[in-house]
Swiss-Prot record:
Residues 25-57, 446-467 are annotated as: Disordered. Glycans are attached at N733. It comes from Homo sapiens (Human). It comes from the Eukaryota. GO terms for molecular function: cell adhesion molecule binding; urea transmembrane transporter activity. The modification Phosphoserine is found at S477. One of its GO terms (biological process) is transmembrane transport. This is Urea transporter 2.
Amino acid sequence: MSDPHSSPLLPEPLSSRYKLYEAEFTSPSWPSTSPDTHPALPLLEMPEEKDLRSSNEDSHIVKIEKLNERSKRKDDGVAHRDSAGQRCICLSKAVGYLTGDMKEYRIWLKDKHLALQFIDWVLRGTAQVMFINNPLSGLIIFIGLLIQNPWWTITGGLGTVVSTLTALALGQDRSAIASGLHGYNGMLVGLLMAVFSEKLDYYWWLLFPVTFTAMSCPVLSSALNSIFSKWDLPVFTLPFNIAVTLYLAATGHYNLFFPTTLVEPVSSVPNITWTEMEMPLLLQAIPVGVGQVYGCDNPWTGGVFLVALFISSPLICLHAAIGSIVGLLAALSVATPFETIYTGLWSYNCVLSCIAIGGMFYALTWQTHLLALICALFCAYMEAAISNIMSVVGVPPGTWAFCLATIIFLLLTTNNPAIFRLPLSKVTYPEANRIYYLTVKSGEEEKAPSGGGGEHPPTAGPKVEEGSEAVLSKHRSVFHIEWSSIRRRSKVFGKGEHQERQNKDPFPYRYRKPTVELLDLDTMEESSEIKVETNISKTSWIRSSMAASGKRVSKALSYITGEMKECGEGLKDKSPVFQFFDWVLRGTSQVMFVNNPLSGILIILGLFIQNPWWAISGCLGTIMSTLTALILSQDKSAIAAGFHGYNGVLVGLLMAVFSDKGDYYWWLLLPVIIMSMSCPILSSALGTIFSKWDLPVFTLPFNITVTLYLAATGHYNLFFPTTLLQPASAMPNITWSEVQVPLLLRAIPVGIGQVYGCDNPWTGGIFLIALFISSPLICLHAAIGSTMGMLAALTIATPFDSIYFGLCGFNSTLACIAIGGMFYVITWQTHLLAIACALFAAYLGAALANMLSVFGLPPCTWPFCLSALTFLLLTTNNPAIYKLPLSKVTYPEANRIYYLSQERNRRASIITKYQAYDVS
């Protein structure tokens, strides 16, 4: 089916699914008769039979048989093999009627009574919670629900029926309804409202809110699908999450009519004795985790669900079990109380994520199988974070973790052909998805040789040269970078304009040489249109000598300022170790929008001055993040520019800064490795979304990763406790006469150092030097931004200690750099805009700090990201406020020259048009 309905399992039937399966048994590669390998020797013993004779037989004896006897024996063998092949095909057909999506059964029901069709839709909707489009599996799941609790079965069935009827009434796509895609959210709504009800079973008044809440699911599904279809994404269980979260938040534990279960945050360190862990209960938690997808904690119910999954798809059953195991292990890794693990509450989100990535929306290969395991692990920790955050407002986590984690992994872009995401219109079940993938792959392989035929002879031109470079690049080392073709992408990862852009340009983020280098006098002379006098005199000779020496100085400076492109070009033929070292240094400096390895060295030096342990943790984060990007086949020019390293360095630094275990707690390096490995995935996913508006991702991957880690562990975690953060509960005692101006001035470099979590003024001063080497304009705006943050803090009576420690300046620093010449061309208008953005970021930082402290979380660089993105989305008719395309962003000085050259070309074209018009 070609309609783009977004959902966990699109109803689009692979019309050739059954034919493909049947073709496996009837294709020429499976011959029904064994051809005679020696037709010239009809009366002689076959060579293969010589080894089968007994040793007492004479080797020289020739076995002779009559021709009709041999023909009869051959015909008997053919008949026997034909009958065996027919039995095989019949068995395959019989199994095909019950497994997969039971397409034949749905076709048979088309002309039957509407009531029978509706029952089929409800059963499919029941199974669609687990990505199963099979009414037999739905029936078995109903049996499992009855084993758990008949009352829950009633409410769940009612939710499915009401949701499906509402979709019919709203005129939703009939094929989607027939596949149960408008029923599974209603099933979960009915079940979970009964599970979290504080009233006893068979509280019949509960059916009213179940009915109304389930009716909202098709509306939410259709609305979300309108948004997600832009990225060809399913809506998963987001309608259920939205509906149930709103219901539980609206009623709560103290509601008179519909009280819900009381959910409270953790307030003490759990008492865990590892010797008390019971292995049988851990093993039992595997089927229980599968059952918790439907809110069931009975292991027999979970076992019945696994049987239902196996009937439709053994691969789904396998990944469900694997996902449950991964969730269990993740819970043990962060010292979760055993009772929570035994009840499967850490596993159900992992079950769904592992199924979704492991063959459902990605074609199953060993690469996507590993990706499914990583997604399940990421989902487990995200669930812990969301659970702790939502417990503050008394709401359970639902399946938010599954939805968010899986969507992130589906937005991943990669150059690895083995990680193949299916179009939603082709998604059915893992086995059929793999057949579709192999069919597409074989078709592409068949077209590849024919594409170089003589019908389209190559023609000279730039496109041919680009194509030849792309072909040659496939045979080069992973670390080989063509620096002459690298284009600065300004912290945007992922494929711009998705597949179309990938096909047109295999390296969409090439790092192009800027129009001029910093302090390039040649270009300055050309842009100023300096005319040299032709007559030779002493004055002109002096001037030419000064110009020549200036050129030499400029050339020398260009080797260490700007982006140090010459360094990258010089390393392209060197050892991969040196190249990787260069990438790590650039990633370290990219936090401050600087693509310069020398600046990276100075920044690492400053980190060691601050705290060697923090420097070790930060460098490890950069290395792991960069390596992960290489493994995921991300764009190599982006890796070489450090775009996949800067989030990793921030993750490593801030996890060490907020650790309550002190310095040199070596076990902390394990979560640092895991969390920094997630940064390239988040960068790629966010880049896929933000490319629609030509926006950078900034430090959003770092913010998401560290916020989830701090929320998942918290202050009371046994293994990885974090710093306790509490909201303000009293008015601060501020005496304005006690303000110390020297400490306020010192807060300017400290605020710059706080970008990396450092409060040492010497470290901040070293960072300023690192910025000045690459770009004086970046250094200037960093100082201005820190100053604006300090002044904004004084205007709202912030305690002096917070100001002295630079906590009010680091977000303003980044915002001022981003707007003041980096993504907008520097003019006096954009300079004022940068100051305004710095002020906005400072006040937004205060707001977010107060809000996140309720959950025990720091604001990180959320204020910078949100304020800078807001200002980059600004539209204006003022030509002096010029936002650069991301493909042209390098550093402020080069950005300014690019803008002036564009303006000069534009004016020249206008003059030419005017002159042509005047002549005519």
